[in-house]
Amino acid sequence: MGLSDGEWQLVLNIWGKVEADLAGHGQDVLIRLFKGHPETLEKFDKFKHLKTEAEMKASEDLKKHGNTVLTALGGILKKKGHHEAELKPLAQSHATKHKIPIKYLEFISEAIIHVLHSRHPGDFGADAQAAMNKALELFRKDIAAKYKELGFHG
């Protein structure tokens, strides 16, 4: 399940491009998530009123939250699987406060892959996509284990 050094390098190479515009990438990821899986929008009280893509694109709050999401994910990815300290508070808040099901983390992972491929097609080929998928799967597996420890079966 772990990633090789080469796979981590592919993940971190593309992540460097994401960090050049975290808010923009994050906004695109959330829009893709909400459009593809409208039920996920119900978990976000401050975004429920956003019904169209144009409204989502115009929302500074959505952009800020996208930045927050991808900043946290970047911190986790940079740990190359040694992310226990970063994962614990994230799992705690997502399990007990926000009640985000693991399925929704799968949905946002799909959105991340889609956005990276659409924004960086020349830098996010099959090998990089496979490596990122593997890294996101590792993240989901580890957060699911934390959820279980917390008694959340989402």
From Swiss-Prot:
Catalytic class of the enzyme: oxidoreductase
Residues where Phosphoserine is found: S4
The enzyme's E.C. designation: 1.7.-.-, 1.11.1.-
Residues bound to O2: H65
Modified residues (Phosphothreonine): T68
Alphabetically ordered keywords of this record: Cytoplasm, Heme, Iron, Metal-binding, Muscle protein, Oxidoreductase, Oxygen transport, Phosphoprotein, Transport
InterPro entries per the UniProt record, alphabetical: Globin (IPR000971), Globin-like_sf (IPR009050), Myoglobin (IPR002335)
Positions of nitrite binding: H65
Protein residues bound to heme b: H94
GO MF, any single term: oxygen carrier activity
Every Globin domain range: 2-148
Catalytic activity: Fe(III)-heme b-[protein] + nitric oxide + H2O = Fe(II)-heme b-[protein] + nitrite + 2 H(+); H2O2 + AH2 = A + 2 H2O
Broad class of where this protein is predominantly found: cytoplasm
Subcellular location: Cytoplasm, Sarcoplasm
Self-association state and partner proteins as the record states: Monomeric.
Family that this chain belongs to: Belongs to the globin family.
Function description: Monomeric heme protein which primary function is to store oxygen and facilitate its diffusion within muscle tissues. Reversibly binds oxygen through a pentacoordinated heme iron and enables its timely and efficient release as needed during periods of heightened demand. Depending on the oxidative conditions of tissues and cells, and in addition to its ability to bind oxygen, it also has a nitrite reductase activity whereby it regulates the production of bioactive nitric oxide.
Protein name as catalogued: Myoglobin
Lineage: Eukaryota, Metazoa, Chordata, Craniata, Vertebrata
